[in-house]
Structures are given as structure tokens and as C-alpha cells.
Amino acid sequence: MINFNFFMNDVVRQAREEIVSAGYTELTTPEAVDEAFKRNGTTLVMVNSVCGCAGGIARPAAAHSVHYDKRPNHLVTVFAGQDKEATARAREYFEGYPPSSPSFALLKDGKIVTMVERHEIEGHEPMQVIAKLQSYFEENCEEL
């Protein structure tokens, strides 16, 4: 019989590796969140999770959406359910939006611009999420 904790640790490790290899910086402490979010420019925050729609839709969208003429200056991620304090701190910046994972938040100069929430990810195709993210990049980001 498979050890559930061993299995989940492997799922979490793979989820972390997938988003980091897509160019996102992991924020694992509240201090790291504050440091990252106070930078000038645009920041895309991917709120990672172990659910199926994170692996099948959100992380692929996170990886592919940034291959676009206009994109955020900074790409970061927090892991809901894993790095709880960092995720809680990040959510303090997402004023007006309920906690949701997976999700994406677009910040400009540390202020929330918009979000793609779980209900806009779950049950959708990765290309739909990519198109939504890129429309936000088009409106809010500069060519890099």
C-alpha cells in the first residue's frame, strides 16, 4: 500500500518544480511576499495548489501565458495549503477578492489590478485561461 504522505510530498514537489521551471520565483515566507510585492512594475502571482485543475490547467497556463510580447516584470508563486503564512500574506494584497486556489493575481506597484479566480480556471481549457491572462498583460504590462 502506498504511503499517502509520501505520495502527497511527491505531488507537492512536482507542482513546485513545474512552476519554478516556468520562470516563477517561489515565495515561501510572509517577508518574501512583502519584498516581492513592493517592487515597482507588474507582478503576476500564481497561487499554486495540489488540486487537479492546478496541474491540468493553471500551471500550464502560467507557463505558456508569459510567452507574449507584453508580460509582467515579475513572476512569483505562493503555494496554498503548503506555505500557509506566505499565502495568507499574499492574499492580504488581493483586496476585494475571496481566497481562491489555484488563481492568478496581477499586481501593479504592489496594488491588485485583477485576478483570475478558481471558478475561471476549473472546468476551462488552458488556452482560455492563457487568453484571459494575456488580455490582462495587454492592458497592464509593457513589452519586455
From Swiss-Prot:
It comes from the Bacteria. Pfam families: Disulph_isomer (PF06491). One of its GO terms (biological process) is cell redox homeostasis. Signal peptide: none annotated. Belongs to the bacilliredoxin family. This is Bacilliredoxin BA_4378/GBAA_4378/BAS4061. It comes from Bacillus anthracis.
